[in-house]
Curated annotation (Swiss-Prot):
Transmembrane segments: none annotated. InterPro entries: MAM_complex_regulator, PDZ, PDZ_sf. It is found in: Cytoplasm. The lineage of its organism: Eukaryota, Metazoa, Chordata, Craniata, Vertebrata. This is PDZ domain-containing protein 11. One of its GO terms (molecular function) is protein-macromolecule adaptor activity. Keywords: Cytoplasm. SUPFAM superfamilies: PDZ domain-like.
Amino acid sequence: MDQKIPYDDYQLPVVFLPSYENPPAWIPPQERIHHPDYNNELAQFLPRTIVLKKPPGAQLGFNIRGGKASQLGIFISKVVPDSDAHRAGLQEGDQVLSVNEVDFQDIEHSRAVEILKTAREILMKVRYFPYNYQRQKERTVH
């Protein structure tokens, strides 16, 4: 004989969902072109080339984080204001795709640092990819 459990005795699971971000307010189509919530300009996310020349003993003007262990790539984590890197257009959140024809998408952090420190002329292919950069920062915060 099956016994039925009263509805009030069920233990319901507790689920925590991420906070919901409300969509932007409706804006007439003719006004959307200049509104940041409706900006669909993707050029900033396209790969670009950065060329830097580093005199002996000089600093690069930027820091990197990540590498093979993070499985997200190498990212620019800081750019020194008014440095050559800053003037060349490097920015925090840029993913380094390659340096001097060396693929940086699956490279150990220490190897990436070695390549950047020893090169006198640096030809970098980067792309602005803030989403993976943010994921990487979240993974490394303790």
